[in-house]
A protein has these predicted regions:
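Soluble or luminal CAZymes and related metallo-dependent hydrolases
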Residues: 8, 50, 97
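Hydrophobic pocket/interface hotspot
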Residues: 13-16, 28-29, 36, 51, ...
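A solvent-exposed, acidic/Ser-Thr-rich amphipathic alpha-helical stretch
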Residues: 26-27, 34-78
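A beta-strand edge to alpha-helix "cap/lid" segment located at domain peripheries
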Residues: 59-69, 73-161
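Alpha-helix initiation/capping motif
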Residues: 2-5, 44, 94
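Short, low-complexity N-terminal intrinsically disordered segments enriched in polar/charged residues
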Residues: 1-22, 26, 30, 149-161
């Protein structure tokens, strides 16, 4: 049985990515429930304010060098998905990243309660870190190292005023 599409949740996802494309973290996180759970290969699992702060940090660190495109948005009453592409310079190496991401969402009371991004970590590591990333990007060692770095950055991040 096919689930019925929900235009309000489709619009919620569209608003999230439109805000991201315009570097508006406050508008992005207004789409999130306060009890949001976010997960991706770089940060692992983040909850609540940590998930919200991550988006502000990524936008601030991009220093205007971030291009977001999105599409293939689908949503029902309880879940949704989108495909999106982030183009940016990796802050640690200055290398160009073009990351193709699939997002899955769960909704509660008109907000996003769960957001899971998946992407090819090996390909991302190769773009971000060059030869070392291509060589080691498939290993748990590299995943843990990148995650540790990302979480340290998030823990030390102070939003721009």
């Amino acid at each position: 049985m096919q689930k019925t599409l929900n235009s309000n949740n489709i619009e919620l996802i569209q608003n999230f990515y439109a805000a991201f494309a315009n570097a508006n973290a406050a508008q992005m996180v207004s789409c999130y429930d306060d009890k949001i759970t976010f997960q991706d290969p770089a940060f692992g699992v983040l909850h609540g304010n940590d998930a919200k702060k991550m988006w502000q940090m990524l936008i601030d660190k991009s220093e205007g060098n971030l291009k977001i495109t999105y599409g293939n948005i689908k949503a029902t009453d309880t879940s949704g998905s989108a495909d999106w592409v982030a183009e940016y310079l990796f802050s640690q190496t200055g290398r160009k990243i073009i990351n193709h991401i699939n997002a899955k969402f769960e909704f509660k009371d008109g907000k996003i309660i769960k957001h899971t991004d998946t992407f090819n970590f090996w390909k991302w590591a190769g773009q971000a870190l060059g030869f070392k990333g291509y060589l080691l990007g498939w290993t748990n060692f590299m995943r843990k190292r990148v995650r540790g770095f990302a979480l340290r950055e998030l823990n030390h991040y102070k939003p721009k005023q």
